[in-house]
Structure formats: structure tokens, C-alpha cells
């Protein structure tokens, strides 16, 4: 056990347990060398806070006394010493804080400025040179343009026009007046509740609207022409018919019946003139048919092919002589005889009949005969006798169709 504990592996394991163990109290060994009393630290902090309060009161009293000397500075401030500092020189940080507090006060254009500082010109002011005094003169514009104000060339010339013209629109500031505004719509931040850009586009005459068209609106009811449009589509609705209107139309008063009777005579004359026009329109309509009907129509209109077929001669020439009469009575038997009548003549030295040709009895080598010498699966090859075999001739006689014994069912 001692050897196991004294080994470097065990020492490293113990060190890892101590280093990476979950210790709740002071895990990282902080403030172990701090032997100071926390109560002493609290007392020093309280004493320091009281000193700061006393110093602040002294500074306020010195500032009040300095203000009574007609805005003049106290000798302590002029010499660079802070009052109540106990003879300590003013640090650079305190000087920066005093300069920042002085810059935050609102200074008038004609107010006194520190001798070593220059006020930077504000936005909208022009800085010029005065020949009489030789100092910088700040000229402030009497009328400054608003941030988002849009003034094209025409509006600058007509500056005396009343401002009520642009009451509905929000002014737009354009830095590059030669180039048209990008994008679609009116000025940025317009009345967004009315679509892209709102109605502010119409007030600017020089505004490039990038092809946007302003349509004129007519005060009319969209339901006034509804019946005429729907009748063009055959009915009060697109899926209705012309007869559906009679069901939905209100009954006409009795006073109009006399007028209808008078107009009926003229309508009859017009209808008689329109009848031939309707017939012409029906003829002009495209005739619809199925695929089978179209195919039949094409076959009827298609020209039939005509072939020049030469007929065989059935007459027997007069000079023909019969050499011998046929032994067969039927033409079918004659055709079979003609097929069998082709006999090939053999030469005298033909030896094909003496050769033995066996297609189905070829010698087959044993399995694995090539690997038998290497210890494979093969067997030793048997010696086969390839000598001449006895000739077995089997002659099949074809049945005779004229013999009822060969075909008893046909008898």
C-alpha cells in the first residue's frame, strides 16, 4: 500500500482531486493573506466621505463669494489653485472637468469668451473675417432651413406664395436635386396609410414619378352597369342564362302595358330582319365533332389507292403438248411431291456417308481435372475408348396422307 501511495500516478491523482474538487468554502483561495480588519476599512471610508462633504461645502462658499465680485475670478482660481485644497495644485483631470462645465453653459453670441478658447461655429453659421477688428466674425443665418424640407427650383423662386399649399405634405430634404428620387412612391415618411407615398406626389411639379400613372376617378356606382355586363355573359351571373332575368326582375306596373303593345309591332319587324343574320352566324360557327366522326369523315374524303394488278392467264396455249399425266389427283399432293422431288446427286468419291457425326455424345472432361495435381477437387481422368462404334441406323417413315391407316380419323 505504501508503494502504491508513493507512486507518481497516485500523487498526480491526489493533486487532481485537490485541484478539481468541488470545494464550497473559498475554492480559489482568495484573500488568504489579507489580515486587515474590515471594520478599519469601513471607518476609513466613512472618514473619507466626510472629508469630501466638507470640501464640497467650501467650494460652494468660495463660488458664491467669487460671484459677488462682479463676475471676477478669485485669486485662487486665477493662480491655478483650487480653493479649499490646502495649498495643493490643481490636477489636469480637474481642469478638464472645469472646462467641460464651462462649455455646457449656454453662451450668447455676444457673450464673453475665455481668452484661450475659441467657440466652434455651429451648424447653419458662417465664419468670416472682419477687416476692421481682425477677428473671426460668426454670422448666424436668420432663417435656417428645416431638416426634411424640400425646396425645388420652382418653389425657391415662388417663395412669397402662401404656405397653405404644403399643409398636407411633409417636406423632404434633397441634397442632390439633379437626380430623381429612388424607389417607388412619394417622399420618405409620407402618409403611409394611403399606400406607397400617399397623396403627396401630386403637389410636386418637378418630381420624377418614374412612370407612375395617376388615374382619374369618376363618381359613379359600380352597380349601375352590373346588369348590362352580366347579360353579356348570358344571365344575371356568369353561370346563368338569359331566361333567368325574368325570375328576378320586379313586376312592371300596369301603366307600361300600353306602351309595350305599341312597341311590339316594331319589334316583330326587327326580329324578321334579324332572323337571316342569326342563321348566317350559326353557319359561321365551328362545327364540333368527336374523334371517331372526324376519322370517318377523313376516310370518306381520302382518295382510294388504285393498283395496276396483272391478272394471270387462264387460257392454255394451243401449241402445248402433255408429256405425261400426273399421278396425283389433288393439287396439294402435287405441291408436296414437287417439294420432295429435289434430289441431290452424290459424287463417286464422296465419303460423308462413312463419317460418324454425333452431336449429342461429345466426350465431357471430369470435374476439376486441371486441378487434380494441385490437391484440388478434381478426379483422375478416365481413359475412354474412342474406337469405332457399331452403326445404328434408325429410319423413320413419314406417314402417307392418302393412307387411311395412317390417319384413321380422316377416313
Swiss-Prot record:
Tissue: Expressed in adult heart, brain, liver, kidney, testis, and in various embryonic tissues, but not in adult spleen, lung or skeletal muscle.
Organism: Mus musculus
Family annotation (PANTHER family): HYALURONIC ACID-BINDING PROTEIN 4 (PTHR12299), INTRACELLULAR HYALURONAN-BINDING PROTEIN 4 (PTHR12299:SF30)
InterPro entries noted in UniProt: HABP4/SERBP1-like, HABP4_PAIRBP1-bd, IHABP4_N
Domain notes from UniProt: The C-terminal region is necessary for nucleus and cytoplasmic localization. The N-terminal region is necessary for nucleus and nuclear bodies localization. Regions containing Arg-Gly-Gly repeats (RGG/RXR-box) may be preferentially methylated by PRMT1.
GO cellular component entries: Cajal body; cytoplasm; cytoplasmic stress granule; Gemini of Cajal bodies; nuclear speck; nucleolus; nucleus; sarcomere
Skewed-composition ranges (Acidic residues): 402-411
Cross-link Glycyl lysine isopeptide (Lys-Gly) (interchain with G-Cter in SUMO2): residue positions: 212, 274, 334
Protein name, UniProt field: Intracellular hyaluronan-binding protein 4
Gene name tied to this protein: Habp4
Ranges for region Disordered: 42-271, 296-318, 358-411
Chain positions with Phosphothreonine modification: 352, 373
Keyword terms of this UniProt record: Coiled coil, Cytoplasm, Isopeptide bond, Methylation, mRNA processing, mRNA splicing, Nucleus, Phosphoprotein, RNA-binding, Transcription, Transcription regulation, Translation regulation, Ubl conjugation
Amino acid at each position: 500500500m505504501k508503494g502504491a501511495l508513493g507512486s507518481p500516478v497516485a500523487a498526480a491523482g491526489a493533486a487532481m482531486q485537490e485541484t478539481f474538487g468541488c470545494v464550497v468554502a473559498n475554492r480559489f483561495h482568495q484573500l488568504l493573506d489579507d489580515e486587515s480588519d474590515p471594520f478599519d476599512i469601513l471607518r476609513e471610508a466613512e472618514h473619507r466621505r466626510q472629508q469630501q462633504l466638507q470640501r464640497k461645502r467650501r467650494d460652494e462658499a468660495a463660488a458664491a463669494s467669487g460671484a459677488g465680485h462682479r463676475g471676477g475670478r478669485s485669486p485662487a482660481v486665477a493662480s491655478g489653485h483650487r480653493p479649499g485644497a490646502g495649498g495643493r495644485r490643481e490636477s489636469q483631470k480637474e481642469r478638464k472637468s472645469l472646462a467641460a462645465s464651462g462649455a455646457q453653459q449656454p453662451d450668447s453670441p455676444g457673450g464673453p469668451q475665455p481668452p484661450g478658447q475659441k467657440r466652434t461655429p455651429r451648424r447653419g453659421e458662417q465664419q468670416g473675417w472682419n477687416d476692421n477688428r481682425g477677428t473671426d466674425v460668426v454670422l448666424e443665418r436668420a432663417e435656417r432651413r428645416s431638416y426634411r424640407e424640400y425646396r425645388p427650383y420652382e418653389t425657391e423662386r415662388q417663395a412669397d406664395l402662401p404656405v397653405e399649399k404644403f399643409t398636407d405634405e411633409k417636406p423632404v430634404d434633397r441634397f442632390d436635386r439633379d437626380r430623381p428620387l429612388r424607389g417607388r412612391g412619394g417622399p420618405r415618411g409620407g402618409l403611409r396609410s394611403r399606400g406607397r407615398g400617399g397623396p403627396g406626389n401630386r403637389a410636386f411639379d418637378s418630381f420624377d414619378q418614374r412612370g407612375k400613372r395617376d388615374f382619374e376617378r369618376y363618381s359613379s356606382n359600380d352597380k349601375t352597369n352590373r346588369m348590362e355586363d352580366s347579360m353579356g355573359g348570358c344571365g344575371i351571373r356568369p353561370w346563368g342564362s338569359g331566361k333567368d332575368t325574368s325570375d328576378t326582375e320586379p313586376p312592371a306596373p300596369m301603366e307600361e302595358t300600353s306602351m309595350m303593345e305599341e312597341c311590339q309591332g316594331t319589334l316583330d319587324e326587327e326580329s324578321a330582319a334579324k332572323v337571316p343574320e342569326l342563321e348566317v352566324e350559326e353557319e359561321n360557327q365551328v362545327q364540333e365533332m368527336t374523334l371517331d366522326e372526324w376519322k370517318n369523315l377523313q376516310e370518306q374524303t381520302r382518295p382510294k389507292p388504285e393498283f395496276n394488278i396483272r391478272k394471270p392467264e387462264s387460257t392454255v396455249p394451243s401449241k402445248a403438248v402433255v408429256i405425261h399425266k400426273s399421278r396425283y389427283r389433288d393439287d396439294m399432293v402435287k405441291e408436296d411431291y414437287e417439294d420432295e422431288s429435289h434430289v441431290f446427286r452424290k459424287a463417286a468419291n464422296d465419303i460423308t456417308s462413312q463419317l460418324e457425326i454425333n452431336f449429342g455424345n461429345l466426350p465431357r472432361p471430369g470435374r476439376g481435372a486441371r486441378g487434380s495435381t494441385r490437391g484440388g477437387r478434381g478426379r483422375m481422368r478416365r481413359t475412354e475408348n474412342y474406337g469405332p462404334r457399331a452403326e445404328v441406323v434408325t429410319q423413320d417413315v413419314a406417314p402417307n396422307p392418302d393412307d387411311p391407316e395412317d390417319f384413321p380419323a380422316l377416313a
